[in-house]
From Swiss-Prot:
InterPro entries: Ribosomal_bL27, Ribosomal_bL27_CS, Ribosomal_bL27m_C. The gene is MRPL2. Belongs to the bacterial ribosomal protein bL27 family. GO terms for cellular component: mitochondrial large ribosomal subunit. It comes from Kluyveromyces lactis (strain ATCC 8585 / CBS 2359 / DSM 70799 / NBRC 1267 / NRRL Y-1140 / WM37). This is Large ribosomal subunit protein bL27m. Coiled coil: none annotated. The lineage of its organism: Eukaryota, Fungi, Dikarya, Ascomycota, Saccharomycotina.
Length: 364
């Protein structure tokens, strides 16, 4: 016998799907005879249409919205842009019929799939000079309110760039990199762009490529109306200058311009630095100063992450307590030692730990 509380599990679960029908709308006259919805096309092939005009009324998606056409809750298709109605098939969606709006009368749909979209920007040429100047100088409200602050920051950046250019010119002469005035005019913007790319997170090779590509495109835009031979001469000079700078100069991890160091030399210097650091045991101020002195030139051949990793490894604020276990006898509290109290959760007692001051980097 089965208990009365047992209930049979249904084999099928019916879920209601809400459709855009008269019954779903909750009308008082639902299920009664009423006027038809006047379904069908409202605009035909090639007819002009305006924004919001209905092109097709339908039950279900007999036709799908194509270019510049939207679809409503009841599957009504309407124009999103003014243009000309097109009924078409799309080879990328076989079995579906589309209705679109072409922006121009002589343009058929579908447009080539892998080409840029055809868009209308809705702009007209302003022939009045005064109105054209006013429109050109017009600013959005947010930018207008921040205009003074933006101009001030822009001027500060320009001053900073000029200071860097003067500094780089001096470094180039100190390192005896042979550049004439014409080459220097390309070298300084190249170095500024190189530094900016490194500051924004580019690696060395990407920063160099981006700097050269940026100056190359800028040069092509400036000289687009001049003779091709002059442009080719300038591009050749830019290539020579960038190659010379890449082989003679570099930036360290503090974004300072220094002499170029090859990857092989950097690996050798890094290995030598690690060997020297392992040989020094920090026990007093002198040994601490020795370790800090080793990091003086490390910025020139180590990346910032490598330098931070080595500093954390060899300049630990507090040495691990495992070194206390190596002592034969525990240390006693004194002026040369530091005593800390710590609660022992296993034994419910307070442990008194005495450590030498040399275990704490800040106490040296």
């Amino acid at each position: 016998m089965f208990s009365s509380s047992w209930q049979q599990v249904p084999k099928f679960v019916v879920q209601q799907v809400r459709t855009a029908t008269k019954r779903a709308a909750g009308s008082r006259t639902s299920m009664k005879d009423s006027a038809g919805r006047r379904l069908g096309p409202k605009k035909y092939e090639g007819q002009a249409t305006q924004v919001g005009e209905i092109i097709m009324r339908q039950r279900g998606t007999k036709f799908y919205p194509g270019e510049n056409v939207g679809i409503g809750k009841d599957h009504t298709l309407f124009a999103l842009e003014p243009g000309y109605v097109r009924y078409y098939l799309d080879p990328f969606h076989p079995g579906k019929k589309f209705i679109g709006v072409s922006l121009y009368k002589d343009v058929k749909l579908p447009l080539p799939h892998f080409e840029p979209r055809l868009r209308r920007f809705g702009k007209a040429i302003i022939e009045d000079e005064e109105k054209a100047i006013a429109e050109e100088n017009a600013l959005p409200r947010k930018i207008y309110l921040l205009k003074d602050e933006l101009i001030k920051k822009q001027q500060e950046r320009e001053i900073k760039r000029e200071e860097l250019k003067a500094e780089y010119s001096k470094i180039i002469s100190d390192l005896k990199v042979e550049l004439d005035q014409q080459e220097l005019a390309f070298a300084l913007p190249y170095l500024l762009r190189w530094r900016t790319c490194l500051k924004n997170g580019f690696n060395e090779s990407d920063a160099r490529f981006n700097s050269y590509y940026y100056l190359e495109q800028e040069l092509k835009l400036k000289m687009r109306n001049q003779e091709k031979s002059k442009l080719d001469d300038k591009l050749t000079l830019l290539k020579q200058v960038s190659t010379k700078l890449n082989e003679s100069l570099s930036f360290n991890n503090k974004l300072e311009l220094t002499k170029y160091i090859s990857p092989e030399e950097k690996n050798t210097l890094k290995t030598q630095l690690i060997t020297d650091l392992k040989a020094i045991d920090i026990k007093d101020k002198n040994s601490k100063k020795q370790v800090l002195a080793k990091f003086t030139d490390a910025k020139n051949f180590l990346t910032l992450s490598e330098e931070v990793r080595l500093r954390r490894k060899f300049l630990k604020p507090v040495k691990p307590e495992t070194e206390l276990k190596k002592l034969e006898e525990p240390l006693k509290p004194s002026k040369k030692n530091l005593t800390t109290r710590r609660y022992n959760y296993e034994q419910n007692t307070i442990d008194v730990i005495t450590r030498p001051k040399t275990d704490f980097l800040s106490k040296l």
